[in-house]
Amino acid sequence: MENNRKIISKNNINVQVFLVRSLIGKLNKKVKVLKALGLNKIGDKKVHFLNESIKGMLNETINMILLSEVM
């Protein structure tokens, strides 16, 4: 999770978001945020440009995702 925080602190980069935890039993708010990011089930991956709105969404669901920087 610490690596996720370092990546979120950067600006104007592309990040790959990987869903590693299930949506079952999670708060409805977190489920909606993950679906807005395009992550519906475990193992889904999406690439997003890291701006302020995406940063807020990633911070909301930081414990359920893994981030990696895409060149």
Swiss-Prot record:
Keyword Ribonucleoprotein: yes
GO-annotated molecular function: structural constituent of ribosome
Ribonucleoprotein is among the record's keywords: yes
Domain of life per record: Bacteria
InterPro entries referenced in this protein's UniProt entry, alphabetically: Ribo_uL30_ferredoxin-like_sf, Ribosomal_uL30_bac-type, Ribosomal_uL30_ferredoxin-like
GO terms under cellular component: large ribosomal subunit
Example GO BP: translation
UniProt keyword terms in alphabetical order: Ribonucleoprotein, Ribosomal protein
Similarity comment: family membership: Belongs to the universal ribosomal protein uL30 family.
The protein's name: Large ribosomal subunit protein uL30
Protein's organism: Borreliella burgdorferi (strain ATCC 35210 / DSM 4680 / CIP 102532 / B31)
Highest classification ranks of the organism: Bacteria, Pseudomonadati, Spirochaetota, Spirochaetia, Spirochaetales
